[in-house]
């Protein structure tokens, strides 16, 4: 035995940000850092609230959040992902309403994305330019409705399985891509 341990839940499979805030508070109580946690959570809430006006004029076009796995597959993020509470707060519909795993994502073949016509698509980069270039050179990709309409953007990486700091980074990335 080295030291006592304590686990904290990352997600309940439904609302990871709500669970992260709860776990942060529990950890702060255990470490007697309640004030620091309260300060951080207040800053988080203020930041999220302050950014909301940036998305008011965006309209109701659904947003598909993705990241490339390989030239034939993407990971898509659905309703129980880290990003959903932010999308809900800002009134941005999540285009992916299909199946997801516990983490709110699922791997899909590229051809499944052809069904998404009137959507904005953001793809989180993660040092995969070679694979992305290979995908973007294919006729299948070039025929995607959102590609032809100029509504596909590569954006900086966001830690999909993070907590409040990742959510704040996501909001900054989202603002740079589709905010107003």
Where do the language-model regions lie?
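Short helices/loops that flank or line small-molecule/ion binding pockets
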Residues: 107-118
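Structured C-terminal subdomain patch of bacterial secreted/periplasmic proteins
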Residues: 15, 19-22, 116-180
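Alpha-helical, coiled-coil/dimerization segments enriched in small aliphatic residues
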Residues: 75-106, 159
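Extracytoplasmic substrate-binding proteins
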Residues: 1-69, 160, 164-180
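Structural recognition of the beta-strand scaffold that forms the well-ordered cores
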Residues: 6-8, 63-66, 95, 121-124, ...
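Short, conserved, surface-exposed binding loops centered on an aromatic residue
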Residues: 53-58, 76, 86, 113-115
């Amino acid at each position: 035995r080295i030291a006592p341990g304590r686990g904290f839940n990352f997600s309940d499979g439904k609302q990871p940000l709500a669970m992260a805030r709860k776990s942060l508070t529990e950890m702060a109580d255990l470490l007697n850092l309640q004030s620091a946690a309260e300060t951080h959570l207040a800053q988080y809430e203020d930041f999220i609230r302050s950014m909301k006006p940036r998305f008011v004029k965006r309209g109701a076009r659904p947003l598909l959040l993705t990241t490339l796995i390989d030239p034939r597959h993407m990971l898509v993020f659905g309703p129980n992902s880290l990003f959903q509470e932010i999308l809900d707060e800002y009134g941005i519909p999540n285009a992916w309403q299909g199946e997801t795993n516990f983490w709110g994502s699922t791997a899909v073949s590229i051809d499944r994305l052809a069904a998404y016509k009137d959507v904005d698509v953001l793809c989180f980069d993660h040092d995969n330019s070679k694979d992305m270039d290979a995908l973007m050179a294919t006729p299948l990709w070039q025929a995607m409705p959102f590609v032809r309409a100029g509504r596909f953007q590569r954006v900086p990486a966001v830690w999909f399985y993070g907590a409040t700091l990742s959510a704040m980074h996501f909001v900054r990335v989202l603002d740079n891509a589709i905010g107003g």
